[in-house]
Amino acid sequence: MLDLFADAEPWQEPLAAGPVILHRFAFNAAEQLIRDINDVASQSPFRQMVTPGGYTMSVAMTNCGHLGWTTNRQGYLYSPIDPQTNKPWPAMPQSFHNLCQRAATAAGYPDFQPDACLINRYAPGAKLSLHQDKDEPDLRAPIVSVSLGLPAIFQFGGLKRNDPLKRLLLEHGDVVVWGGESRLFYHGIQPLKAGFHPLTADCRYNLTFRQAGKKE
């Protein structure tokens, strides 16, 4: 499918209580980002993690950076070691780091120092249930989330799971940044609809940057 808006300029969409959508912010960097995703996955392959309750997640995941988000029978945690390879997670590519810092600065977080990037791969039908990002030691640091490939519906709620949800269309190259009052808001991705994108074929990638260790 051709992108009819390939020449459109990036633009910001501030939302209530802190989140900002940076539309098309990652568009020009997308090809390099996807090459680097493939390089990371060649070292730490995508896998469908199993939650502590025994549920196999529909989204395939891997990590890069000093710390990687993973699961075990005790819960969710960050670890410097990939439990599948028993090696350190791949280093965060420079393209990832540069984009993340530019996006964080554009959204008002110039001091953000990401040390973890969770890479999610969505096939048609894959989803991410409502959840809070609360496994990080310093919740003052924001979340930076990059969308690549097929479009998806991003659900963004409040501090309670049953708070009303905003449903926002995220397209190729969009970046969402949230922190402050909204840092612990529930969020998720609705089941991905089938489609085709010239850079990612039948899937969507998401890069989620966090500060998972203590800031030096």
Q: Positions of the model-derived regions?
A:
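Non-heme Fe(II) oxygenase metal-center motifs and adjacent flexible, charged/small-residue loops
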Residues: 1-216
